[in-house]
């Protein structure tokens, strides 16, 4: 559906997430740098009357909108999932490559283009040794039900990727910030 361009990326887009915000669609994607080493987030936009064809999408930035900078993110930010809350977008994302360990972070944006991490620490860490997610808690997906409750679905494993499990937790909100019980 979309092919990013520019010197900042390798020309591929994976892990797509589409959301409607401020009168248009935003397509968030993961891409890598030219050396295929660092994975980061990019964004494209389309009008609300799109047929979701490739030619309907316009790259919204000529650089990454979220790049791995925190130690726990390693060389990778991927698997973004977006939830709208109080006229803001919250991006839950996987930091670090699978089983490095991968953990979940959160960033916030008021315009869909400029993002700020809510913390330099993971929102959801991998589990302790012996727990079901000791190798990874990653690839988040957010779901908001008809009652307005938000749920975080994510994958994990404790054997460095030989098996995978998926679980969910309700995301609670206080003062514009998400938290887990």
PLM regions: where:
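Carbohydrate-active catalytic/glycan-binding domains of CAZyme proteins
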Residues: 1-181
């Amino acid at each position: 559906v979309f092919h990013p361009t520019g010197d900042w990326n390798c020309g591929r887009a994976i892990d797509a997430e589409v959301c409607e915000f401020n009168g248009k669609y935003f397509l968030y994607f993961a891409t890598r740098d030219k050396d295929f080493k660092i994975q980061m987030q990019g964004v494209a936009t389309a009008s609300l009357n799109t047929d979701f064809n490739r030619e309907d999408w316009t790259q919204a930035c000529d650089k990454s909108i979220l790049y791995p900078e925190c130690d726990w993110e390693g060389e990778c930010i991927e698997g973004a999932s977006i939830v709208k809350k109080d006229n803001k977008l919250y991006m839950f994302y996987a930091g670090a490559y699978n089983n490095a360990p991968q953990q979940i972070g959160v960033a916030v944006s008021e315009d869909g283009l400029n993002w700020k991490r809510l913390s330099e620490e993971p929102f959801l860490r991998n589990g302790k040794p012996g727990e079901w997610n000791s190798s990874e808690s990653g690839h988040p997906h957010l779901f908001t039900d008809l009652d307005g409750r938000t749920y975080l679905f994510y994958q994990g494993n404790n054997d460095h990727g030989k098996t995978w499990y998926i679980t969910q937790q309700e995301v609670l909100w206080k003062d514009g910030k998400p938290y887990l019980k």
